[in-house]
Amino acid sequence: MSPQTETKAGVGFKAGVKEYKLTYYTPEYETKDTDILAAFRVTPQPGVPPEERGAAVAAESSTGTWTTVWTDGLTSLDRYKGRCYHIEPVPGEEEQFIAYVAYPLDLFEEGSVTNMFTSIVGNVFGFKALRALRLEDLRIPVAYVKTFQGPPHGIQVERDKLNKYGRPLLGCTIKPKLGLSAKNYGRAVYECLRGGLDFTKDDENVNSQPFMRWRDRFLFCAEAIYKSQAETGEIKGHYLNATAGTCEDMMKRAVFARELGVPIVMHDYLTGGFTANTTLAHYCRDNGLLLHIHRAMHAVIDRQKNHGMHFRVLAKALRMSGGDHIHAGTVVGKLEGERDITLGFVDLLRDDYIEKDRSRGIYFTQDWVSLPGVLPVASRGIHVWHMPALTEIFGDDSVLQFGGGTLGHPWGNAPGAVANRVALEACVKARNEGRDLAVDGGDIIREACKWSP
């Protein structure tokens, strides 16, 4: 037990408030391979030194509280406390700085994203000494990564299951998102899959509403899948949303999907919660189901530039909790997304080892060892004229998902699906022949129009 935290009979306990930096600011600390490292963007209240605020973040997200307590003497704070080990200014922002905090691995339950976030992004975000706080990135040590199952199957296993290689996968969200009967919904699924798409998708809002109960939807979608497979000779899927009001109902829906023999289910992992998501991911691996993840509610957490969490942290958490696909923005569609930053967290989803690269927003080198990769899904506000850019930006290991870009075709759902498939095949063929999609993309699509509705 260190001298700072040891309680000795001759000294006694001294109550009172003391500065956080006396205990939790340790610039001389050398980080360990087993530490979880965090980069926080801190906006302190005026007049508070950066060292004190960085130490406060470390304290309030680990062992500290607002005052000295006598039970500090019953454990070793030096072993368990978080440490602010480095502070750097944010270029162009006089009132902000980045505080780097190291957390001992023993603070966290094995295999629990829920517990990790409860500590690191818990009460500290309401700390009144801070005007704003944003978690920019985490370094997850190999020792902790190995306690997680991660994605149920991963990229290579999914391609083997689908027998589809050498191109991005194509998807479509069925619209209108709410209001269709189960039979009409299944009809739209069939038309899109028959037209050439690999997947169709429940919108994140679709659970089990009065106009379409989940069991009816599952049955009609399964019929559409099997009919389109028989007619095209390709393996097809529909993301059946298993998200429900309770974990028990969620699992009931996943079990029914498995009994129908469909290849994939879906979960809204932020609104459903990490505990539910990890439970579903384990079931999917054990039972051969792929798991599509929607990120509904993410903008509540990651939209603000100085408070909350960056999506790269949520992406890392999803890879640990488990999912084979996750929506990751588009760069070219109707949602926000800077190209380099987006590709940074896309690589964090797919690759085994990612080097630190601040130009892409990656604060730490991340080694995922044997954890399977996740396919990024580009969706929202995209159409066939975006196909060259999407193919170039996201590469083969991705899902390109067109909702209105399929169902909005003037000739109907099936021609819209055909148009997307023809555009994708044309872009992949042109790329493989050495053509520059960024330069020739428009010409490639115009040439493909000859063979497409």
UniProtKB/Swiss-Prot annotation:
Binds 1 Mg(2+) ion per subunit. Pfam families: RuBisCO_large, RuBisCO_large_N. The disulfide bond which can form in the large chain dimeric partners within the hexadecamer appears to be associated with oxidative stress and protein turnover. RuBisCO catalyzes two reactions: the carboxylation of D-ribulose 1,5-bisphosphate, the primary event in carbon dioxide fixation, as well as the oxidative fragmentation of the pentose substrate in the photorespiration process. Both reactions occur simultaneously and in competition at the same active site. One of its GO terms (biological process) is photorespiration. The basic functional RuBisCO is composed of a large chain homodimer in a 'head-to-tail' conformation. In form I RuBisCO this homodimer is arranged in a barrel-like tetramer with the small subunits forming a tetrameric 'cap' on each end of the 'barrel'. The modification N-acetylproline is found at P3. Heterohexadecamer of 8 large chains and 8 small chains; disulfide-linked. The disulfide link is formed within the large subunit homodimers. Residues 1-2 form a propeptide. The modification N6-carboxylysine is found at K201. GO terms for molecular function: magnesium ion binding; monooxygenase activity; ribulose-bisphosphate carboxylase activity. The gene is rbcL. InterPro entries: RuBisCO, RuBisCo_large_chain_AS, RuBisCO_lsu_C, RuBisCO_lsu_C_sf, RuBisCO_lsu_fd_N, RuBisCO_lsu_N_sf, RuBisCO_lsuI. Mg(2+) binds at K201, D203, E204. It comes from Asperula laevigata (Smooth woodruff). This is Ribulose bisphosphate carboxylase large chain. Substrate binds at N123, T173, K177, R295, H327, S379. The modification N6,N6,N6-trimethyllysine is found at K14. It comes from the Eukaryota. It catalyses: 2 (2R)-3-phosphoglycerate + 2 H(+) = D-ribulose 1,5-bisphosphate + CO2 + H2O; D-ribulose 1,5-bisphosphate + O2 = 2-phosphoglycolate + (2R)-3-phosphoglycerate + 2 H(+). PANTHER family: RIBULOSE BISPHOSPHATE CARBOXYLASE, RIBULOSE BISPHOSPHATE CARBOXYLASE LARGE CHAIN. The record marks K334 as: Transition state stabilizer. Keywords: Acetylation, Calvin cycle, Carbon dioxide fixation, Chloroplast, Disulfide bond, Lyase, Magnesium, Metal-binding, Methylation, Monooxygenase, Oxidoreductase, Photorespiration, Photosynthesis, Plastid. It is found in: Plastid, Chloroplast. GO terms for cellular component: chloroplast.
